[in-house]
């Protein structure tokens, strides 16, 4: 089997690359180790509304569970800050359907798609990578390709086999645990985020509504914490008198939140999405970031193939670090500052921020918010709070 491009992994990043490159007329094979693309989900399933237009994805109600109008955050002592729009700001997806449809769009664009195909190694000849070795339904398979895209998730095999350093210590990952369950008493038009060092150490509890009385209820905490994410989620549910007898699905996963892979290209191998740790460090979401990286990667793959010059692939890494890197580094800086906050700090800051401030913080445009907070008496009276905020300037 020979192709111009083989894409390993059919989550969000992989099909985006495959679709765009196939549209340009090149032969593409998209493979995924799962028997059913999109399962199991490892995601809270929330995404901003802008993604559909930006990445040319149909707004298809088949994979949209619920439209969302904003967010509400809760401090340890119960103080709240709310951001509510008059228009739809995001949606809660059905990832099992969404991921499969992204693969479908890639196939419609001309890519070939193979599920239940696990890539286990790269093929080297004369010191160069010329393809990948895989197992398709247990049978060995060799796939030759001019370009290889590692979109195979946080534990990327291909990036590592190609010699790209994707290592990160356990502390740089969050452990996620989530129930899809029946739940009442929370506005289903908003996502809800609960903070506190006893609630979710270094993370938060989320409620992402999928229906009037059904939601993804999950938690992310430091993966090296002595207690498990499940322990803290069950504890929170019990403390809030939320029954645990109507759980429809359980999902677990690791989220890379501590930094990004520096070398995104090595020779003819590109790494994108979770495999490159291209995840928003503040909230742990990675779908939009994955599609953005995939779009940049696809652009340079097309140019490299058109000009028969694989050296052009390096421009993907350069462009991502130039256009996305500064914002992502600022968000990482913000996350590290947030990790130092006590419950009292969280109470103070949630009381002081507005809904608009929340939007700016989540997007990395936080300088004016920080400057305003630094003038407030509750911050000025605390040298430690001032130092935490100053570190963000």
From Swiss-Prot:
Protein's pathway: Membrane lipid metabolism; glycerophospholipid metabolism
Keyword Oxidoreductase: yes
SUPFAM superfamilies tied to this protein: FAD/NAD(P)-binding domain
Pfam families in alphabetical order: FAD_oxidored, GGR_cat
Positions bound to FAD: 13, 32, 43-44, 46, 95, 119, 274, 286
Keyword Magnesium: no
Cofactor(s) recorded in Swiss-Prot or TrEMBL: FAD
One biological process term in Gene Ontology: membrane lipid biosynthetic process
Cofactor note: Binds 1 FAD per subunit.
GO cellular component, one term: membrane
Highest taxon of the lineage: Archaea
MF GO annotations: flavin adenine dinucleotide binding; geranylgeranyl reductase activity; oxidoreductase activity, acting on the CH-CH group of donors, NAD or NADP as acceptor
Top class in the EC scheme: oxidoreductase
Reactions accelerated catalytically: a 2,3-bis-O-phytanyl-sn-glycerol 1-phospholipid + 8 A = a 2,3-bis-O-(geranylgeranyl)-sn-glycerol 1-phospholipid + 8 AH2; 2,3-bis-O-(phytanyl)-sn-glycerol 1-phosphate + 8 A = 2,3-bis-O-(geranylgeranyl)-sn-glycerol 1-phosphate + 8 AH2; CDP-2,3-bis-O-(geranylgeranyl)-sn-glycerol + 8 AH2 = CDP-2,3-bis-O-(phytanyl)-sn-glycerol + 8 A; archaetidylserine + 8 AH2 = 2,3-bis-O-phytanyl-sn-glycero-3-phospho-L-serine + 8 A
Keywords linked to the UniProt accession: FAD, Flavoprotein, Lipid biosynthesis, Lipid metabolism, Oxidoreductase, Phospholipid biosynthesis, Phospholipid metabolism
Residue stretches in coiled coil: none
Xref: InterPro entries: DGGGPL_reductase, FAD/NAD-bd_sf, Geranylgeranyl_Rdtase_fam, Geranylgeranyl_reductase, GGR_cat
EC number from the UniProt entry: 1.3.-.-
Binding site for a 2,3-bis-O-(geranylgeranyl)-sn-glycerol 1-phospholipid: 327, 363
Family stated for the protein in its record: Belongs to the geranylgeranyl reductase family. DGGGPL reductase subfamily.
Additional remarks: Reduction reaction proceeds via syn addition of hydrogen for double bonds.
Task performed by this protein: Is involved in the reduction of 2,3-digeranylgeranylglycerophospholipids (unsaturated archaeols) into 2,3-diphytanylglycerophospholipids (saturated archaeols) in the biosynthesis of archaeal membrane lipids. Catalyzes the formation of archaetidic acid (2,3-di-O-phytanyl-sn-glyceryl phosphate) from 2,3-di-O-geranylgeranylglyceryl phosphate (DGGGP) via the hydrogenation of each double bond of the isoprenoid chains.
Name of the featured protein: Digeranylgeranylglycerophospholipid reductase
Organism, as annotated: Pyrococcus abyssi (strain GE5 / Orsay)
